[in-house]
Each structure stands twice: as structure tokens, then as C-alpha cells.
């Protein structure tokens, strides 16, 4: 398995605050995510601004698209995103059209695994060409005390076996990473664990050290 990447999630309410954290962390992460809350507040300009600030990083438009996959993908990739998220509840036609536009633009679609979905759904996404999904505990699940469990790991392994690479998020810390050693991990996504830390670059370094220890290979 390839070495997982480290993704900074920017779920800020203002672009100014998000860009301050990017300034602190852009040299310590591989991927910068324009989070859903940020994009709802700041619009398409958030993606454009992050692309300008981080010309050499992977930029994610975390829009959780449910319809109009082709149109929104064209806007996301046109603004400078490399990846765009589509919610798992979206019709397969939406995923297919979004994926087709991503292919034309040199980007990728990530399926956001929120709520109800099945492994048959995952096989359908893989069949039409999607190769990425995001597995996570949402904010509400974390607040209720939900922990990563065997059921989560079994589902992740099943998704990996289908051929999907997973970005994993939901209160992730460096100490959690050994749980996922048998999973096909594309990236670990951290928001508050990085941006909210007293020493963000040090925490990012701890993530990379754990990734190196488990998966091997130095960061490019």
C-alpha cells in the first residue's frame, strides 16, 4: 500500500481565518480542504483563494454534492480543486456525471460516506470509475462519545477490498493511526487536531512520523 497523505480540513467560518492556518501548516501537509462550512460562507472564492495560496498542493472542494454533479464538478475543478466530494446518498447518475467531468478536468471524485450506504453502493461507485471514498465519524458522533470500533474497521477493510482508497477523518490524532494499518488509506484528514493545536507544525510532524513508522517511506 502507498504511503497515506496528510490533509488539513478547513471548516472555518471565514476565509481569513482559514488562510491564517494554511500559512502555518501548508508546508506540513499534502492536501488542503476547502471545508463545507467554509464554502457555504465564502462561496466558490474559497477554493480559488486556496488554490492561489497553495499552488502545489492537492485542493479538495468538500461540497457533499447531492445533485447537479456535472455542473458543480465543472465549477469546482474550474476554480482550482483537484478533488470534489459527492454525498453517498446522491443518485448514481449524479456520481457518474460528476466523475465524467472530473475525468475531463483531470480531477477525482470522493464519495462522502455519511449516513446510510451499502457495499453494493460501493461496488457501483467503483464500477463507474470512482476510486476514492471518505470514511468518518461526524461532529455529532464524536460529541456523543462514539469511538472507532471493530465494525468501522471491518467496513473499511471491505471497502478497501472493493478497490476504494479511503480518506479517514473524525477527531483523528496521531495515536489513532495504528488502528488503520490494514486499510487502503489515501489520506488522514485532521482539522481541529492540527489548526487548534498549540504547535500545529509539531502535531503535523507527529502525524508524519506515525505514518512513516506504519507504512514506511519518507514524505515526498
Curated annotation (Swiss-Prot):
Kindly give the Pfam families that the UniProt entry links to this protein.
OMPdecase
Record: residues binding Mg(2+):
33, 62
Keywords for this protein: Carbohydrate metabolism, Decarboxylase, Lyase, Magnesium, Metal-binding
State its Enzyme Commission number(s).
4.1.1.85
Residues annotated as binding substrate:
11, 192
- A single GO molecular function term of this UniProt record: 3-dehydro-L-gulonate-6-phosphate decarboxylase activity
Assembly: Homodimer.
Instruction: Specify the protein name.
Output: 3-keto-L-gulonate-6-phosphate decarboxylase SgbH
Native source organism of the sequence: Escherichia coli (strain K12)
Amino acid at each position: 500500500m502507498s504511503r497515506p497523505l496528510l490533509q488539513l480540513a478547513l471548516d472555518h467560518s471565514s476565509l481569513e481565518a482559514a488562510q491564517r492556518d494554511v500559512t502555518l501548516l501548508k508546508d506540513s501537509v499534502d492536501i488542503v480542504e476547502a471545508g463545507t462550512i467554509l464554502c457555504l460562507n465564502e462561496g466558490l472564492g474559497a477554493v480559488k483563494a486556496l488554490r492561489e495560496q497553495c499552488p502545489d498542493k492537492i485542493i479538495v472542494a468538500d461540497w457533499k454534492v447531492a445533485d447537479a454533479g456535472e455542473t458543480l464538478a465543472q465549477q469546482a475543478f474550474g476554480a482550482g480543486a483537484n478533488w470534489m466530494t459527492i454525498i453517498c446518498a446522491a443518485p448514481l447518475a449524479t456520481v457518474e456525471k460528476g466523475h465524467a467531468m472530473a475525468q475531463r478536468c483531470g480531477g477525482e471524485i470522493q464519495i462522502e460516506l455519511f449516513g446510510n450506504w451499502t457495499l453494493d453502493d460501493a461496488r457501483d461507485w467503483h464500477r463507474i470509475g470512482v476510486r476514492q471514498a471518505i470514511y468518518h465519524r461526524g461532529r455529532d458522533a464524536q460529541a456523543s462519545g462514539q469511538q472507532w470500533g471493530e465494525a468501522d474497521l471491518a467496513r473499511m477493510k471491505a471497502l478497501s477490498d472493493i478497490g476504494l482508497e479511503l480518506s479517514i477523518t473524525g477527531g483523528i490524532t496521531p495515536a489513532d493511526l495504528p488502528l488503520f494499518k490494514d486499510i487502503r488509506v489515501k489520506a488522514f484528514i485532521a482539522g481541529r487536531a492540527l489548526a487548534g493545536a498549540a504547535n500545529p507544525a509539531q502535531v503535523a510532524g507527529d502525524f508524519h512520523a506515525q505514518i512513516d513508522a506504519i507504512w514506511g517511506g519518507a514524505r515526498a
